[in-house]
């Protein structure tokens, strides 16, 4: 059984036992979080949401918080000695999908 959930402005296909990296959640490590925006549930029977599947939830356990690899944003203007360098590390939360309730 799998589901498509929406979290952090992104849609993710998840299965039970899967580890996923999502946008940072306001939860402590070891906490259980519930995703209510379930757009699709697949398996033996298929449930398609309009826009979400009513009564369907996905529960997950927070494993850790962290920051992704640094990306460099560099902009310049040719021949004008104008250079700006900026780095960014996006925070994330690693969760393990425990149960899909449909």
UniProtKB/Swiss-Prot annotation:
Molecular function in Gene Ontology: rRNA binding; structural constituent of ribosome
Pfam families: Ribosomal_L21p (PF00829)
Entry keyword set: Ribonucleoprotein, Ribosomal protein, RNA-binding, rRNA-binding
One BP annotation, GO: translation
Function, in words: This protein binds to 23S rRNA in the presence of protein L20.
InterPro entries tied to this protein: bL21-like, bL21-like_sf, Ribosomal_bL21, Ribosomal_bL21_CS
Source organism of the structure: Geobacillus thermodenitrificans (strain NG80-2)
Protein name: Large ribosomal subunit protein bL21
Family the entry assigns: Belongs to the bacterial ribosomal protein bL21 family.
Origin organism lineage: Bacteria, Bacillati, Bacillota, Bacilli, Bacillales
GO cellular component terms, semicolon-separated: cytoplasm; ribonucleoprotein complex; ribosome
Known partners and oligomeric status: Part of the 50S ribosomal subunit. Contacts protein L20.
